[in-house]
């Protein structure tokens, strides 16, 4: 048991899974701080992972080869850009048409799963492969972790800290947060509330897609045919609430939940026990929300449509 828990393999998985969860939490933060409830984080992650899997085929010369790691510098940005189209659809429905945010988010989640399933089922004709695989293989020698994993982990931490600084110490960031609290006050100052909301939705979707890319690159995800991101989009919402819609606490909590996820999925045992253990991170998040959730107050205008007539 101890060998399965304390290993470089689990550490390597954690270096990819922790950034995925942290970025997913940031995705929720970016949307709710402008008053948009975004439960489509899971769907955004699925689209990001799917596009990254598809992009990896463009750099594979032979059927049995793996895409070179340097191609990630091209694949990840393109995957995020492609996935942003989903954010545009979300914005049209939630901001322009003023549809219910939760219903729109549910639709995006279902859309992501459906499209990913279609691509995986037609992988032989579309990709000349038997499955929708993540065709990246990083070098790991002996008791070590991949350089790519360390780089992605460091990038995620720096990126999140940069967003934290912008949100708390710049005029634009303070206005951004004010949109989720009282958009009518912002509107009376001649500032476009819709502009900030559109930016929030698009940024949230792109960060969710980036989280999906990180998850898909984890060594424990050899195939993306099921479009399964282990419900990280939903657990990210729970962590956002536990963190009281603050970035710094999420930087601490997200890696801890990711560690619990990696350790439970790495336990060697019979199938029934393994699936039961995988529920531990989700059970913990529910228990913590039950204990501390009532103390947390989110942005006052979250989930409400902006109405200029309420000035």
UniProtKB/Swiss-Prot annotation:
Keyword Cell membrane: yes
Keyword list, A-Z: Cell membrane, Membrane, Transmembrane, Transmembrane helix
Transmembrane domains' residue ranges: 11-31, 34-54, 72-92, 101-121, 147-167, 198-218, 233-253, 257-277, 279-299
Cellular localisation: Cell membrane
Membrane topology, from the record: Multi-pass membrane protein
GO cellular component: plasma membrane
InterPro entries for the chain: ABC_transp_permease (IPR001851)
Pfam families (UniProt xref): BPD_transp_2 (PF02653)
Source organism (scientific name): Mycoplasma pneumoniae (strain ATCC 29342 / M129 / Subtype 1) (Mycoplasmoides pneumoniae)
CDD domains tied to this protein: TM_PBP1_transp_TpRbsC_like
Name used for this protein in its record: Uncharacterized protein MG121 homolog
Record GO terms (molecular function): transmembrane transporter activity
């Amino acid at each position: 048991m101890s060998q399965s828990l304390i290993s470089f393999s689990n550490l390597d998985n954690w270096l990819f899974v922790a950034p995925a969860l942290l970025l997913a939490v940031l995705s929720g933060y970016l949307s709710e701080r402008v008053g948009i409830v975004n439960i489509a984080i899971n769907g955004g992650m699925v689209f990001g992972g799917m596009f990254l899997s598809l992009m990896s085929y463009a750099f594979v010369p032979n059927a049995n080869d793996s895409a070179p790691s340097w191609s990630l510098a091209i694949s990840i940005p393109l995957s995020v850009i492609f996935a942003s189209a989903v954010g545009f659809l979300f914005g049209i429905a939630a901001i322009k048409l003023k549809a219910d945010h939760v219903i729109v988010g549910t639709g995006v989640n279902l859309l992501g799963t459906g499209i990913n399933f279609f691509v995986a089922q037609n992988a032989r004709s579309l990709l000349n492969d038997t499955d929708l695989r993540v065709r990246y293989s990083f070098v790991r020698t002996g008791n070590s972790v991949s350089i790519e994993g360390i780089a992605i982990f460091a990038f995620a931490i720096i990126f999140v800290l940069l967003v934290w600084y912008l949100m708390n110490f710049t005029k634009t960031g303070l206005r951004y947060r004010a949109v989720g609290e009282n958009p009518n006050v912002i509107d009376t100052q001649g500032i476009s509330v819709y502009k900030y909301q559109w930016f929030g939705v698009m940024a949230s979707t792109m960060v969710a897609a980036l989280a999906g890319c990180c998850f898909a690159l984890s060594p424990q995800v050899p195939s993306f045919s099921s479009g399964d991101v282990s419900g990280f989009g939903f657990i990210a919402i729970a962590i956002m609430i536990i963190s009281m819609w603050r970035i710094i606490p999420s930087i601490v909590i997200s890696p801890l939940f990711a560690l619990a996820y990696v350790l439970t999925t790495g336990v060697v045992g019979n199938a029934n026990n393994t699936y039961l253990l995988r529920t531990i991170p989700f059970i913990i998040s529910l228990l913590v929300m039950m204990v501390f959730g009532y103390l947390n107050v989110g942005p006052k205008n979250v989930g409400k449509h902006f109405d200029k007539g309420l000035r």
